[in-house]
């Protein structure tokens, strides 16, 4: 867990509440995603860790973001710069996405398989997870050859390991005990 998670929550909550009030949740998520990527830039990271005045830092950051930030997004950047919190932007984005998922009653589900799954297989997994979690799900599919066959499904703290690799590991544990 990131060191900035506690710092990020109030900024994410304020941004999310504002976005909901102004019916611009998608726009805000896009702005935060862009700003979070800017913080990961090597040159910007040097500026963020430097001794620039908050006003100068905020204006430099806003200049780099250009038209990706609207006036309200720029205001958030200024407030975060004043408080020395621009490094927390990736965590603000993460918290914002979490608040959005809770608000929309959706859950992110990672599906890891050895090969690409068919639309029919994805539909079955989606339906089963929606029933199990009692909410809509968004599937994030990844291919990992080490799975060998089967799938690994992750939703929050829940992990369903139906992979051959997982079965072999469990069998090895039983044989060694």
From Swiss-Prot:
Supply one GO BP term.
proton motive force-driven plasma membrane ATP synthesis
Where would you find this protein in the cell?
Cell inner membrane
Membrane topology for this entry? Peripheral membrane protein
The protein's name: ATP synthase subunit delta
* Subunit details: F-type ATPases have 2 components, F(1) - the catalytic core - and F(0) - the membrane proton channel. F(1) has five subunits: alpha(3), beta(3), gamma(1), delta(1), epsilon(1). F(0) has three main subunits: a(1), b(2) and c(10-14). The alpha and beta chains form an alternating ring which encloses part of the gamma chain. F(1) is attached to F(0) by a central stalk formed by the gamma and epsilon chains, while a peripheral stalk is formed by the delta and b chains.
SUPFAM superfamilies linked: N-terminal domain of the delta subunit of the F1F0-ATP synthase
Its family remark reads: Belongs to the ATPase delta chain family.
Location, primary (coarse class): membrane
What's in the GO CC field?
A: plasma membrane; proton-transporting ATP synthase complex
Task: Quote the InterPro entries the UniProt record gives.
Answer: ATP_synth_OSCP/delta_N_sf (IPR026015), ATPase_OSCP/d_CS (IPR020781), ATPase_OSCP/dsu (IPR000711)
Record keywords: ATP synthesis, Cell inner membrane, Cell membrane, CF(1), Hydrogen ion transport, Ion transport, Membrane, Transport
The UniProt entry, under Pfam families, shows: OSCP
What's this protein's function? F(1)F(0) ATP synthase produces ATP from ADP in the presence of a proton or sodium gradient. F-type ATPases consist of two structural domains, F(1) containing the extramembraneous catalytic core and F(0) containing the membrane proton channel, linked together by a central stalk and a peripheral stalk. During catalysis, ATP synthesis in the catalytic domain of F(1) is coupled via a rotary mechanism of the central stalk subunits to proton translocation. This protein is part of the stalk that links CF(0) to CF(1). It either transmits conformational changes from CF(0) to CF(1) or is implicated in proton conduction.
Which portions of this protein are annotated as coiled-coil regions?
A: none
The terms under GO molecular function for this entry are:
proton-transporting ATP synthase activity, rotational mechanism; proton-transporting ATPase activity, rotational mechanism
Instruction: Report the gene name.
Output: atpH
């Amino acid at each position: 867990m990131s060191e900035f998670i506690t710092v990020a929550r109030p900024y994410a909550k304020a941004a999310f509440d504002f976005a909901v009030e102004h019916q611009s949740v998608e726009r805000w998520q896009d702005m935060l995603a862009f700003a979070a990527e800017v913080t990961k830039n090597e040159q910007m990271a040097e500026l963020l860790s430097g001794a620039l005045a908050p006003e100068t830092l905020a204006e430099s950051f806003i200049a780099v973001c250009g038209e990706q930030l609207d006036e309200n997004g720029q205001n958030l950047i200024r407030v975060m710069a004043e408080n020395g919190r621009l490094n927390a932007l990736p965590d603000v984005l993460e918290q914002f996405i979490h608040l959005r998922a809770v608000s929309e009653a959706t859950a992110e589900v990672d599906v890891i398989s050895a090969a690409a799954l068919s639309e029919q297989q994805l539909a079955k997994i989606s339906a089963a997870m929606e029933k199990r979690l009692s909410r809509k799900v968004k599937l994030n599919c990844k291919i990992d050859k080490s799975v060998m066959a089967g799938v690994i499904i992750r939703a929050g703290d829940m992990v369903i390991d139906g992979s051959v690799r997982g079965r072999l590991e469990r069998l090895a544990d039983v044989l060694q005990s």
